[in-house]
Amino acid sequence: MSQDFSREKRLLTPRHFKAVFDSPTGKVPGKNLLLLARNNDLDHPRLGLVIGKKSVKLSVERNRLKRLMRESFRLHQDSLVGWDIVIVARKGLGDVENPELIQHFGKLWKRLARNKPVPAVKTETVGVDSPDA
């Protein structure tokens, strides 16, 4: 898998975000943030970011956080295949330094990867009502 962060690896529409918020199959709470994830049945993960002005006041800080989150996701996406992930920032996240944040995200990705979705296996059921029986 390539290490890019192309358009196909992003959650873009409100419908995509709503699907993750309404029925997350994975939740990883962290210090000053929350990771919500949902199975996506694709061969790649997708990322969405929610960083409001209420939780991180300065736009410079919000942009720094988004840049670090995208970079960390890009580097760990091989272990996150099959997830739609939304990161929700909480108060105080803007005060965390870059090295600490990078380390924190590494741990969060590992915790999420442990709950990796299992691909659906197609099986044929042969029953009494089937025409072959």
UniProtKB/Swiss-Prot annotation:
Q: Which SUPFAM superfamilies match?
A: Ribosomal protein S5 domain 2-like (SSF54211)
Q: Under which main EC class is this enzyme filed?
A: hydrolase
Reactions that this protein is recorded to catalyse: Endonucleolytic cleavage of RNA, removing 5'-extranucleotides from tRNA precursor
- Give the GO cellular component terms, alphabetically: ribonuclease P complex
Q: Does the keyword Hydrolase apply?
A: yes
Show the Pfam families listed in the entry. Ribonuclease_P (PF00825)
Task: Please state the Enzyme Commission number of this protein.
Answer: 3.1.26.5
One GO BP: tRNA 5'-leader removal
Give the superkingdom in one word.
Bacteria
Q: Which residues form a coiled coil?
A: none
Keywords assigned by UniProt?
Endonuclease, Hydrolase, Nuclease, RNA-binding, tRNA processing
Q: Any idea what job this protein has?
A: RNaseP catalyzes the removal of the 5'-leader sequence from pre-tRNA to produce the mature 5'-terminus. It can also cleave other RNA substrates such as 4.5S RNA. The protein component plays an auxiliary but essential role in vivo by binding to the 5'-leader sequence and broadening the substrate specificity of the ribozyme.
NCBIfam families from the UniProt entry: rnpA
PANTHER family membership? RIBONUCLEASE P PROTEIN COMPONENT (PTHR33992:SF1)
Q: What is its quaternary makeup?
A: Consists of a catalytic RNA component (M1 or rnpB) and a protein subunit.
Identification of the protein by name: Ribonuclease P protein component
Q: Which organism is it from?
A: Pseudomonas fluorescens (strain Pf0-1)
Upper classification of the organism: Bacteria, Pseudomonadati, Pseudomonadota, Gammaproteobacteria, Pseudomonadales
Q: Which gene encodes it?
A: rnpA
